[in-house]
UniProtKB/Swiss-Prot annotation:
GO cellular component term of the entry, any: cytoplasm
Transmembrane spans: none
Gene3D superfamilies xref list: Imidazole glycerol phosphate dehydratase, domain 1 (3.30.230.40)
Protein name, per record: Imidazoleglycerol-phosphate dehydratase
Intracellular or extracellular location(s): Cytoplasm
Encoding gene per record: hisB
Keyword Iron: no
């Protein structure tokens, strides 16, 4: 069977990941801070595999991969004999395809890490849109962490956030910048948005409180925010900062977001219903619809332009 250049390079690239133990370990071996670039490379090679004119892996990247894995020059571009992976390696790491599938969905990379550093905040956000609802949050703002945990748990999205902010001033920059960075992560993880449902909505009650959230991953940022909190502070947290947080998400994920608190007397309940509903609506919107068969849910043919 004659392989295209891209098919041959993809096969050898996956072999490198297999030998390293996973694509994440290969990225670390090659000096990358996160594996995002290599996941995107894999996704591109898979899309172009059948195209005999595709450019494949660029020479500079090929040289970098070969250098850091101890392969001779040109190794990625040559056909090699199939060889069996040692049993111990297979048991400890699984195949490269298995490792990749654990971190990226069948439709491409849906797990990313974003770093954002300013004079006011230093933030790292990692998300997995196809996760299990786990969160690890270290922001210095406990009530905001409690709310973001609701997004993770009800959205079935793994969220890891580390933030060092200028809390000696107040929580404003921290809340806003976490929203910005989380929005950037959502946008990157969604990629070209092919096959997703695009729209999501949820009503969530908590005792006397009821909130509705509606999402459109349209590529057009817009926030409609209707919440009249019954008090200005929840503990020490300024409730005005919730709107700043959601503005950050909306403007950097490029989503349209409608938030309506329909009833509520307890401010904690009001906030919690909003964040739970947002998580559930986001889960619906990012899910892959098998009936879409990888198509973009838009008559324009794109949700990223």
């Amino acid at each position: 069977m004659n392989l295209t250049k891209t098919q041959r390079q993809l096969h050898n690239f996956l072999t490198l990941a297999q030998e390293a133990g996973s694509l994440s370990k290969l990225a670390k071996l090659c000096g990358y801070r996160t594996p995002v670039a290599l996941y995107k490379l894999k996704q591109r090679l898979e899309k172009q595999a059948e195209d005999p004119d595709a450019r494949g892996i660029r020479p500079s990247l090929m040289a970098k991969l070969e250098k850091h894995t101890g392969k001779p020059k040109g190794w990625l571009d040559r056909k090699h004999r199939e060889r069996t992976v040692p049993e111990t390696a297979a048991e400890s790491t699984g195949t490269a395809e298995t490792q990749i599938a654990e971190t990226a969905s069948a439709a491409g990379c849906r797990s990313v890490t974003v770093n954002r550093n300013t004079c006011e905040t230093q933030i790292t956000v990692s998300i997995n849109l196809d996760g299990s609802g786990k969160s690890r949050l270290d922001t210095g703002v406990p009530f905001l962490e409690h709310m973001i945990d609701q997004i993770a748990r009800h959205g079935m999205i793994d969220i890891d956030i580390s933030c060092k902010g200028d809390l000696h001033i107040d929580d404003h920059h921290t809340a806003e910048d976490i929203g910005i960075t989380l929005g950037q992560a959502i946008r990157q993880a969604l990629g070209d948005k092919k096959g997703i449902r695009r729209y999501g909505h949820s009503y969530v009650p908590l005792d006397e409180a009821l909130s509705r959230v509606v999402i459109d991953l349209s590529g057009r940022p817009g926030l409609v925010y209707n919440i009249e909190f019954t008090r200005a502070l929840i503990g020490r947290f300024d409730v005005d900062l919730f709107e700043e947080f959601f503005h950050g998400i909306v403007n950097h994920s490029m989503m349209t977001l409608h938030i309506d608190n329909l009833s509520g007397k307890n401010a904690h309940h009001q906030a919690e219903t909003v964040f739970k509903a947002f998580g559930r609506a986001l889960r619906m919107a990012v899910e892959h619809d098998p009936r879409m068969a990888g198509q973009t849910p838009s008559t324009k043919g794109t949700l990223t332009a």
